């Protein structure tokens, strides 16, 4: 029940032509939807609504994914979002944390996985250190407490793309481009 009826019909038409394919029974959503054919990815008005972009081969689909990424469009492929969930959560959590909110210990540990030891936090306070793993999972931690007790070396006023130094530059630029176009990064 993932696809609208018109898209489901097109998918059924395609898969019925695949020789040796095991039949799979599945049904469409109740909505009708619409199927449009475009010769080029850039002919698609991506800024209007949600799109399911299909390609004849995985190679073409990979090229489309790379093109979408280079332009800052958020997408999912094979059920995986183009911005990994843990990365997205770390960005959102840093934004909350830097505004003075407290975070549960597990979210602080996730933040530390995107920081570099020795420059962003004191060595020995890594996300898998005995000390971090011994924190009560219900404990709420603020940035000032993390600086005092968890070896945090970063300024709480830093933007996420400066603070989360383990996120590679390409991914940071991709996410920043998506945010500029007001795309939902999740």
Question: Which positions does each model-derived feature cover?
Answer:
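The feature marks helicase ATPase cores and/or their adjacent C-terminal helical subdomains
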Residues: 1-186
């Amino acid at each position: 029940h993932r696809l609208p009826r018109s898209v489901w019909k097109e998918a059924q038409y395609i898969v019925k032509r695949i020789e040796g394919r095991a039949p799979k029974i599945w049904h469409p959503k109740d909505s009708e939807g619409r199927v449009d054919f475009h010769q080029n990815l850039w002919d698609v008005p991506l800024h209007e609504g949600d799109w399911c972009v299909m390609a004849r081969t995985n190679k073409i689909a990979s090229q489309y994914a790379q093109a979408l990424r280079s332009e800052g469009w958020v997408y999912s492929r094979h059920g995986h979002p183009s911005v990994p969930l843990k990365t997205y959560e770390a960005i959102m959590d840093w934004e909350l944390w830097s505004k003075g909110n407290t975070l549960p210990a597990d979210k602080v540990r996730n933040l530390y996985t995107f920081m570099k030891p020795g420059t962003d936090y004191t060595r020995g306070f890594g996300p898998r250190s005995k000390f971090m793993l011994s924190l009560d999972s219900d404990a709420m931690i603020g940035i000032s407490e993390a600086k005092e007790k968890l070896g945090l070396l970063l300024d709480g006023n830093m933007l996420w793309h400066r603070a989360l130094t383990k996120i590679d530059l390409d991914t940071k630029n991709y996410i920043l481009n998506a945010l500029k176009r007001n795309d939902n990064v999740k």
